[in-house]
């Protein structure tokens, strides 16, 4: 994918935001939107300069490689949540052909380097049972994920599909299922 620079902040702007944030007592920063790891060199510089802060990015995972994992381990204050929407076929349908395999490789690298990471899961009317199934959760836990962010699908824009929205029964299912996953007794060893 190609990403434009029109709306990107310069390193100096990001540094200024963090510096001002620290003056206000803010020490945790999130990178979202587009693909933050197209700026991974600047993010690592920011982590180095502000080693008293924590940084977290929501990423599609396709730009995670061994060198980047080494840099993350070196700075020690940067974590990622890798977007995942189901097993290979379902994930690739929404994220692009071959993305599931790239995400699995990224997770393997994260685990190999002992890095804390998690998943970012957008659940829809089509995938909500799969992404909360024991089989799926066991897979991401086996891969090394320590946490999972769950976001419900929200159509944006004039052409956005509303068929992926959950109906009331599906929303209620998710409400209860997430609490089961979080439960101390019989729950999964992952923070959801």
Predicted regions and their residues:
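Short, conserved sequence motifs enriched in acidic/basic residues, glycine, and aromatics
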Residues: 6-8, 63, 165
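Canonical Radical SAM [4Fe-4S] cluster-binding loop centered on the CxxxCxxC motif
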Residues: 1-11
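A C-terminal junction/extension of Radical SAM enzymes
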Residues: 153-192
């Amino acid at each position: 994918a190609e990403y434009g620079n029109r709306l990107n902040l310069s390193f100096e702007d990001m540094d200024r935001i963090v510096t001002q944030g620290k003056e206000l007592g803010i020490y945790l920063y999130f990178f979202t939107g587009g693909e933050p790891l197209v700026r991974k060199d600047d993010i690592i510089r920011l982590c180095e300069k502000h080693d008293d802060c924590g940084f977290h990015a929501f990423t599609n995972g396709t730009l995670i490689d061994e060198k980047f994992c080494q840099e993350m381990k070196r700075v020690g204050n940067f974590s990622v949540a890798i977007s995942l929407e189901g097993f290979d076929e379902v994930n690739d349908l929404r994220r692009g052909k071959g993305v599931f395999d790239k995400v699995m490789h990224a997770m393997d690298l994260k685990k190999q380097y002992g890095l804390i990471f998690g998943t970012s899961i957008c659940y829809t009317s089509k995938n909500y049972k799969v992404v909360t199934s024991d089989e799926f959760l066991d897979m991401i836990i086996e891969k090394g994920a320590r946490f999972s962010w769950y976001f419900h699908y929200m159509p944006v824009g004039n052409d956005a599909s509303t068929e992926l929205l959950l109906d009331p029964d599906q929303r209620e299912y998710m409400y209860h299922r997430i609490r089961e996953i979080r439960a101390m007794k019989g729950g999964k060893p992952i923070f959801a």
